[in-house]
Amino acid sequence: MATKKAGGSSRNGRDSAGRRLGVKKSDGQYVIPGNIIVRQRGTKIHPGINVGLGKDHTIFSLIEGRVEFLTKQSHKIVNVKEIANV
């Protein structure tokens, strides 16, 4: 006879790695074409002027300039403002 009861195996104890989502460039930061500004699931933040939207809803810069976040009619929007050449 067993002197100890068999220990049950736990059904927990696993977790997936984080997906590294979120804002990658903040308001006023300098970007070049192709720089990722936001990684997201769905369009929590909408693309504005001079930014592109990838098939995974990643927002990226199309031009060289500064990032600008704003809210219009309860939509968060991100633009890239061109820097004037002096």
From Swiss-Prot:
GO terms for biological process: translation. InterPro entries: Ribosomal_bL27 (IPR001684), Ribosomal_bL27_CS (IPR018261). Residues 1-26 are annotated as: Disordered. One of its GO terms (cellular component) is ribosome. The keyword Heme does not apply. Keywords: Ribonucleoprotein, Ribosomal protein. The keyword Ion transport does not apply. One of its GO terms (molecular function) is structural constituent of ribosome. PANTHER family: LARGE RIBOSOMAL SUBUNIT PROTEIN BL27M, RIBOSOMAL PROTEIN L27. This is Large ribosomal subunit protein bL27.
